[in-house]
Regions:
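Mid-to-C-terminal alpha-helical segments outside catalytic/metal-binding sites
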Residues: 1-5, 16-29, 85-86, 212-218, ...
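Mid-domain alpha/beta scaffold segments of enzyme catalytic cores
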Residues: 1-112, 116-120, 191, 237, ...
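Short active-site segment of divalent metal-dependent hydrolases/proteases
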Residues: 9-10, 130, 163, 225
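Short aromatic-enriched loop/helix-cap "lid" or pocket-rim segments at secondary-structure transitions
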Residues: 15-16, 43-45, 82-84, 110, ...
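Flexible loop residues that form catalytic
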Residues: 35, 75, 101, 129, ...
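Ligand-binding grooves and catalytic loops that recognize ribose/phosphate and carbohydrate rings
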Residues: 37-62, 131-147, 230-247, 256-261
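A structural motif corresponding to the C-terminal end of an alpha-helix
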Residues: 59-67, 150-154, 211, 245-252
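Catalytic pocket-lining loop regions of alpha/beta-barrel enzymes
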Residues: 94-95, 103-218, 301, 305
Length: 306
């Protein structure tokens, strides 16, 4: 099974188009994040985030086999715990995305929403590391997320391997490993969506694999919907090339492509039936223009990232 655990909604996508893109990329399950970066939505406007959550709820309704909807909340909002509960219990979303902009994960006033997430038993995805749109990344250093350990049982994923603080991110994830906590019970896992620019990618992923292992790493394209399946597939090709360079074995690849995210989402790991694609995920072909042998090839980065 292949899970894309990091897909941004814009508010302009339709369910059929999303599923077609996933089919074309041979992705079995997509984690759809409520829009917060596109026109009409803002992390600083709780009312717009409620509309965003309603939008993604409509997209995923009736397609829980293929789509997992994540709410977006601003934990500084005193009503955020209530909005989160409504998104999960009423709208049917299954997780939440948060972006530390103007708040630190250890701030006292954001702890109630983390406590509510723990009560709801949902996975959380956080932006970690630098931004590429000019915002300050000072709120998003991986060690700041250690405060979440005050809420044992949370299931947390830090995006982008915390780049440029990859070593910090690995250290945060390593604590449970040192203490002998089984992978499925570890608080932190990390998505390998492309925060690191090309010169850093192999080193960042290689270190994470060597220290944390594949059970704590999961694929996320960080694509912005609506997009073509070819765009998602291209980013998958980048990961395939890295895994080939690092000589990662088949079992570890299965965990990175889907097993780790399936456990994080509370799924059984069985691949649902796709609509149009009949090819096996293990038979993935890189896009023709994916220069697997050119590690210096620049990524086509957007001017927004989280």
């Amino acid at each position: 099974m292949i899970v894309d655990a990091h897909l941004h909604c814009s508010g302009a996508e339709r369910e059929d188009d999303v599923l077609r893109s996933l089919d074309d990329a041979r992705v079995d399950v997509g984690v759809l994040l409520a829009p917060f970066l596109s026109e009409g939505f803002s992390l600083d406007d709780p009312a717009s985030l409620r509309r965003a959550n309603e939008h993604v709820a409509r997209l995923v309704r009736g397609r829980s086999d293929r789509l997992a909807g994540f709410a977006v909340v601003d934990p500084r909002d005193r009503e955020a715990p209530l909005h989160l509960r409504h998104a999960i219990e009423t709208l049917g979303l299954v997780g939440a995305k948060m972006v530390p902009t103007g708040w630190y994960p250890y701030d006292a006033d954001v702890q109630p929403v983390f406590a509510e997430a723990r009560r709801l038993g949902i996975p959380l995805l956080f932006h970690s590391g630098i931004f590429i749109d000019g915002r300050s990344g000072r709120f998003c250093r991986p060690t700041f997320f250690e405060a979440l350990r005050d809420h044992p049982g949370l299931k947390v994923c830090l995006a982008h391997l915390g780049w440029p603080w990859v070593d910090e991110a690995i250290a945060v994830g390593l604590i449970d490993r040192i203490l002998g906590v089984p992978a499925e019970d570890c608080m932190f896992r990390f998505d390998i969506s492309f925060g690191p620019p090309p010169p850093y990618r192999r080193e960042a992923l290689g270190r994470a694999l060597e220290v944390l292992g594949p059970d704590l790493l999961q694929f996320g394209s960080d694509c912005f919907l609506p997009c073509s399946g070819a765009e998602i597939a291209e980013r998958m090709g980048w990961v395939h090339a890295l895994l080939d360079e690092l000589e990662v074995d088949a079992d570890a690849r299965k965990r990175i492509w889907g097993g780790t995210a399936a456990a994080w989402l509370g799924r059984d790991g069985a691949a649902p039936a796709r609509g149009t694609s009949t090819s096996s995920p293990s038979g993935f072909d890189r896009p023709a223009d994916d220069a697997a042998d050119e590690p210096s090839r620049p990524l086509r980065l957007r001017d927004v990232c989280c």
